[in-house]
Amino acid sequence: MTTLEAVILGIVEGLTEFLPISSTGHLILVSNLLGIQQTEQHKAFEVSIQLGSILAVVFLYFKKFLDTNLMKRILIAFIPTGILGFVLYKIIKSLFNPYIVVFMLVFGGLLLILIELYHKNKSYDINSIYEVPYQKAFLIGVFQSLAMVPGTSRSGATIVGGLLLGLDRKTAAEFSFMLAVPTMFMATFYDVYKNRSNFNLSDWENLIVGFVVAFISALFAIKWLLKFISNHSFIPFGIYRIILGILYYLWY
């Protein structure tokens, strides 16, 4: 992998991680377009640069992470994914291919549109991340565990789960952002540890480049998304997922 490719993948990761359009799916698709093979080493790179996106959330929400009651909710939501991710690690890795990504992009897009249409004239009961009940936090975590299939979108699954459970768009998005921290940190740490012997000096340099670029890109993406959903629904993201999935299927 070249430094330029690391920069491109870092931008893709940072811009898509917290949008409901599947960062993993985009990384796989872009890697294929760049002619990069999906080796175990490259898969580890894709997961590892997510650390940059994680730190962007920590940077923006640092004070909220110091709230004990809020962190209890986040940790409860993390439990389903933490357990299933550890148990199903090898199976999840075997699913990293473009065809599964295309299917999940289209399916997830349709689901996102249907959920928004269903909630079009309904009010939301929960308007703050501090108000999310523990049982609903756990259920959002269950939704997140479904997103272990590439192309599903972790943020998309948690946002859909939040909307179905009565969270408004901003609350669902912010809870999704914060839940990403323990989830992605554990996934990143585990992948880097398992593949540490496969990285040479050049690989580590590319990891650092991808990490920094992902961090900067994620800062912009998070701020933009919160501003966008204050006046718009998630339907445009659903349409985007469907179009992207169809175009890539036709091209591939």
From Swiss-Prot:
The enzyme's E.C. designation: 3.6.1.27
Query: Membrane-spanning residues where?
Result: 1-21, 42-62, 74-94, 95-115, 172-192, 206-226, 232-252
Source domain of life: Bacteria
A Pfam family annotated for this UniProt entry: BacA
Tell me the GO molecular function terms: undecaprenyl-diphosphatase activity
The topology of this chain with respect to the membrane is: Multi-pass membrane protein
Q: Which family does it belong to?
A: Belongs to the UppP family.
Function, in words: Catalyzes the dephosphorylation of undecaprenyl diphosphate (UPP). Confers resistance to bacitracin.
Name the record gives this protein:
Undecaprenyl-diphosphatase
